[in-house]
């Protein structure tokens, strides 16, 4: 595995089209990402995306490479700069990633939220689904839905994707991240390949070690299924939010046990592949180091998104300016070697924790 950290350069004015993806439902808003020759989509870093730092882009390169090499075909992300983009769409940066489109002319994607709105299933309570960043999602009801009960192969593919999402410590693997690939008549062909790897625990909060460790522990606890202690989430003042966190705290474990019981072959296949990855991370760790590219930003401030949120989402310029003053110069220069070494160790630990749950004889 050689990780590829060269930067692709685009000019916004040279785009050949725009990918219009209406964010359906829960997080509303339209995204018009530019498309360039070779069917490459430029996906910018967003100023209002929670906890966003340049590592979000590096994480996409890192995980798409690993998923492709060790698990299943997936579109490969590359670092990219699109000059002139921020000038036109100021809530985005000129920095981001470039990724080939996941579907061909005439095809389209239908995510799980859209799917269950179109084909309701009483086992899936889609109306009460919430897209909440930094939360783990329960996939058991989705597997129980008639469509996946009747389509074994797609269910196995989904099981593999859920397992990989746990491995990459995805803090945002919600029902809009999983999609079916549809033909021109809307007929479902297969599960779409995995995209979107930004919210990987190992690459979050590089500038704030205590928060980094807190969320790493949340991931570990959810994998192991440790019971929630009374009052554990009392620091979440909003009762809805608190309920979500309490549910999230054990749901990875439930997903793992469900997949292990219902999809034993996929579980074995995943364990074999994860074991190979763990060996490579140990024996050839140099291959997995993130090489910071000098053309790309190298400063991280996990709170800077609050400025963007105030300015572009809440339209509150006063609040935005206050955050700007408060956070000015707070960013931390990224030490890519340091980040990579700790990420490699954390990933190996998570593989071991997953193995423990998935290999355990009941």
Regions found by a protein language model. Name each.
Residues 55, 132-209, 349:
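Conserved kinase catalytic-core segment
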Residues 102-142, 226-257:
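Extended low-complexity intrinsically disordered regions
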């Amino acid at each position: 595995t050689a990780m590829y950290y060269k930067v692709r350069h685009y000019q916004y004015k040279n785009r050949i089209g725009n990918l219009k993806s209406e964010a359906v439902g829960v997080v509303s808003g339209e995204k018009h990402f530019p498309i360039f020759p070779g069917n490459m989509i430029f996906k910018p870093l967003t100023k209002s995306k929670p906890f966003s730092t340049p590592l979000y882009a590096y994480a996409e390169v890192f995980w798409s490479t690993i998923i492709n090499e060790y698990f299943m075909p997936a579109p490969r992300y590359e670092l990219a700069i699109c000059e002139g983009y921020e000038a036109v769409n100021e809530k985005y940066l000129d920095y981001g990633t470039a990724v080939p489109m996941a579907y061909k002319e005439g095809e389209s994607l239908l995510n799980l939220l859209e799917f269950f709105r179109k084909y309701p299933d009483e086992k899936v309570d889609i109306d009460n689904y919430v897209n909440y960043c930094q939360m783990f999602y329960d996939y058991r009801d989705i597997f129980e839905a008639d469509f996946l009960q009747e389509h074994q192969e797609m269910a196995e593919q989904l099981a593999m994707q859920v397992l990989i999402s746990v491995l990459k410590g995805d803090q945002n693997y919600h029902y809009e991240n999983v999609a079916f690939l549809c033909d021109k008549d809307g007929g479902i062909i297969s599960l779409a390949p995995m995209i979107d790897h930004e919210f990987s625990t190992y690459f979050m909060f590089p500038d704030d070690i205590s928060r980094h460790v807190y969320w790493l522990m949340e991931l570990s606890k959810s994998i192991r299924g440790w019971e929630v202690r009374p009052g554990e989430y009392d620091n979440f003042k909003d009762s809805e939010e608190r309920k979500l966190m309490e549910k999230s705290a054990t749901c990875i474990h439930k997903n793992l046990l469900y997949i292990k019981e219902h999809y034993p072959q996929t579980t074995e296949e995943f364990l074999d592949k994860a074991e190979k990855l763990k060996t490579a991370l140990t024996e050839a760790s140099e291959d997995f180091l993130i090489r910071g590219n000098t053309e790309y930003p190298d400063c991280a401030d996990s709170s800077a998104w609050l400025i963007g949120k105030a300015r572009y989402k809440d339209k509150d310029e006063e609040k935005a300016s206050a955050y700007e003053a408060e956070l000015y110069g707070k960013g931390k220069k990224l030490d890519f070697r340091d980040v990579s070494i700790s990420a490699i160790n954390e990933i190996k630990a998570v593989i071991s924790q997953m193995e423990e749950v998935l290999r355990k004889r009941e």
